[in-house]
């Protein structure tokens, strides 16, 4: 896009003098707007300013170094402001049209197959990417759970979760679990960041949070991460199907036998997801207590329901592997 300069002012905002019309797609966490803009009634693009101050230049880096290795599962990057522009950074993408952010197992399986591909990239391809994601690493998350142990116990008691789960929280905080190698992660792969076009194609969006992490990070965001604006109902059968697909696809890409450690990997996932969901419940609970929140409270209540359901289902799946005491107290509400 050689003429991008005529559409963007030096301060990194759209120049209305050379634009036919514009419409807001969504608002970033820093208040800046991602917009579709038309240069004529027939031709449109997507303008994305820096929407998160901690991710400056990262999405462009991922496009330049990573995404060209994959099929067209992402909108094409047409122009950018160049590195080091700070709050004046911007990018322009192709407009892939109206998008549907609706959960289906078919879509999730398509995404997880591509995920296995970027997780299988050797470290030499992503060695220069920043190490931080949009949320704390799992070790920091569980440390916070221990710091807020009194609140955690209240939530666990309310949901009928045995205090035995606190033992696993302490083990993870000590670094005794989740010791696998880190891979390149999308970083924020909830339902709002992948979508179906009108022609039925699946696109994976918003790569500005890409960073090295455990493969469980991306899997949790795809499967069990809830979002106030993009509700979904995850089932145990869908969760199993997505995990099986990921394990088999990863094994095929790496030339290994997927069945060898399938149960162990699933147990790690269920524990990771339960810990992350418990932490998310504390965040949602905090938002619900605020008089003014970023999200409508009815949306937060829906998110609470989805997250608590994921937590309980993952603990029940973990219980299926246990011979002795379980995580779920069967006497509660019986």
Residue ranges with predicted function:
Residues 98-133:
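Conserved kinase catalytic-core helix
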Residues 273-334:
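ATP/Mg2+ or Mg2+-diphosphate-binding catalytic cores
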Residues 86-98:
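Conserved short submotifs of the Hanks-type protein kinase catalytic core
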Residues 76-87:
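Short beta-strand micro-motifs within the conserved protein kinase catalytic domain, predominantly
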Residues 31-57:
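ATP-binding glycine-rich loop module of kinase domains
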Residues 130-175:
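Active-site catalytic-loop/activation-segment of kinase and kinase-like phosphoryl-transfer enzymes
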Residues 216-255, 273-294:
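Active-site activation/catalytic loop segments of kinase-like enzymes and analogous catalytic loops
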Residues 14-39:
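ATP-binding glycine-rich phosphate-binding loop
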């Amino acid at each position: 896009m050689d003429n991008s300069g005529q559409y963007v002012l030096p301060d990194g905002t759209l120049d209305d003098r050379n634009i036919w019309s514009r419409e807001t797609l969504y608002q970033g966490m820093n208040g800046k707007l991602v917009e579709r803009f038309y240069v004529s009634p027939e031709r449109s693009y997507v303008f994305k300013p820096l929407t998160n101050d901690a991710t400056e230049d990262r999405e462009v880096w991922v496009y330049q170094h990573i995404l060209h290795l994959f099929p067209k599962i992402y909108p094409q990057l047409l122009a950018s402001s160049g590195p080091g522009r700070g709050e004046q950074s911007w990018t322009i993408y192709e407009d892939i049209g109206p998008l549907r952010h609706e959960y289906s197992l078919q879509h999730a399986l398509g995404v997880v197959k591509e995920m296995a591909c970027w997780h299988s990239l050797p470290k030499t391809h992503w060695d220069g990417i920043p190490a931080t994601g949009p949320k704390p690493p799992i070790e920091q998350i569980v440390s916070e759970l221990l710091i807020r142990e009194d609140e955690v116990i209240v939530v666990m008691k309310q949901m009928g979760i045995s205090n035995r789960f606190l033992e696993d929280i302490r083990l993870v905080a000590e670094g005794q679990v989740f010791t696998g190698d880190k891979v390149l992660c999308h970083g924020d792969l909830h339902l709002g960041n992948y979508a179906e076009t009108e022609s039925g194609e699946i696109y994976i969006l918003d790569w500005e949070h890409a960073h090295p992490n455990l493969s469980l990070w991306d899997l949790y965001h795809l499967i069990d991460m809830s979002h106030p604006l993009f509700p979904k109902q995850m089932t145990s059968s869908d969760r199993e199907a997505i995990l099986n697909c990921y394990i088999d696809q990863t094994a095929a890409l790496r030339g290994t036998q997927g069945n060898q450690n399938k149960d162990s990997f699933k147990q790690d996932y269920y524990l990771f997801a339960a810990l992350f969901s418990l932490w998310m419940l504390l965040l949602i609970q905090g938002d619900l207590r605020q008089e003014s929140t970023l999200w409508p409270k009815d949306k937060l209540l829906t998110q609470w329901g989805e997250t608590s359901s994921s937590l309980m289902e993952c603990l029940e799946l973990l219980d299926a592997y246990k011979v002795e005491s379980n995580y779920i107290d069967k006497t509660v509400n019986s």
